[in-house]
Amino acid sequence: MASRNIWRVRRNFLFDLRGWVPQYSAEVFLKSIPFRPFSVECNSKDGENGDLLNNLLTMGVDVDMARRRQPGVFNKAVTNEQELKMFLLSKGASDKVIGSIISRYPRAITRTPESLSKRWDLWREIMASDLEIVNILERSPESFFRSNNNLNLENNIKFLCSVGLTHKCLCRLLTSAPRTFSNSLNLNKQMVEFLQETGISLGHNNPTDFVRKIISKNPSILIQSTKRVKTNIEFLQSTFNLDKEDLLLLICGPGARILDLSNDCTKRNYTNIKKRLLSLGCTEEEVQKFVLSYLNMIFLSEKKFNDKIDCLLEEKISTSQILENPRVLDSSIHTLKTRIRELAHAGYDVSTSSIALLSWSQRRYEAKLKRLSG
């Protein structure tokens, strides 16, 4: 009878705790060691919470990635991964998305359900649906989980509304530069005040409208330093010899996009553009006019700019054609080569005709190609 009882004890027992179904043998049972509600094997390091690691593995979290990003989370005795999972599932997130969010920003599991709910409600004041927020979290989990200071978030929303930002602009900010709302309120105030002062100094008669224009053109500007933005404004003014009126028009328009670019990157890329075009026989005035006509080219690294110029020159396209059509530099080298080849096959010679269609949208280009091909 005793041996039969022991045999029964040696059978595996199934427990269903918090959704897990691990198995335990008699050796564990007879030693009176408390059962752990996890069965996934993992290699925990000293000081790490083994149960947490097993739990995260079961949830599809890339533990190695999470360790590299925020190792301290795994030493915490109390975490809220199950509560986080249930909360995000209720908002429409999939298991795969939840695993990805925690893998890239493991600190998310330290947020309480109450804090998550409050923060979500504040975001919903701006976004139209839960799914839109889930999409932002999937792309940038840090933007939502980086801070649990919901009062700061609420104050930022109120402040940005008070300076004239529309609901549409706030929505774009949250979508494109969500870290804006995790900034301290003082940081956002400093940037807005700096922009207002800049607008006034350049002769803008409505500083609030100036701020709104800059932010709508460049949502990322609020997460940059005032020093960086100021240096880029000074660079534009000195490089292109602009008076206040022209500078104002530039930074309220296409120039707004480069205000948050690294100062070193701005100068290095422009220096390369200038050097390359001068080597092709352009004058300094032509270089300035070329860059001002399409400032986006300043985002091109030295290699990308030079490779695209080389590609165009190899196809017998002249420097003057490039100067007249700076937007062709927006297209990838693959697109440029493919279109030039297709146009040649259709009897269109880019060396003697307009090259503007090299930068057209795919739909517009295909319609043109169809007409050329008869």
Swiss-Prot record:
Residues 1-37 form a transit peptide. One of its GO terms (molecular function) is double-stranded DNA binding. The record marks 139, 179, 327 as: Interaction with DNA. Residues 146-147, 224-228, 301-308, 332-335, 361-368 are annotated as: Interaction with DNA. Keywords: DNA-binding, Mitochondrion, Phosphoprotein, Repeat, Transcription, Transcription regulation, Transcription termination, Transit peptide. It is found in: Mitochondrion. InterPro entries: MTERF, MTERF_sf. Coiled coil: none annotated. Is a phosphoprotein. While the DNA-binding activity is unaffected by the phosphorylation/dephosphorylation state, only the phosphorylated form of the protein is active for termination activity. Functioning seems to be regulated by phosphorylation. GO terms for cellular component: mitochondrial matrix; mitochondrial nucleoid. Belongs to the mTERF family. Transcription termination factor. Binds to a 28 bp region within the tRNA(Leu(uur)) gene at a position immediately adjacent to and downstream of the 16S rRNA gene; this region comprises a tridecamer sequence critical for directing accurate termination. Binds DNA along the major grove and promotes DNA bending and partial unwinding. Promotes base flipping. Transcription termination activity appears to be polarized with highest specificity for transcripts initiated on the light strand. Contains nine structural repeats of about 35 residues, where each repeat contains three helices. The repeats form a left-handed superhelical assembly with a solenoid structure that wraps itself around DNA. This is Transcription termination factor 1, mitochondrial. It comes from Rattus norvegicus (Rat). The gene is Mterf1.
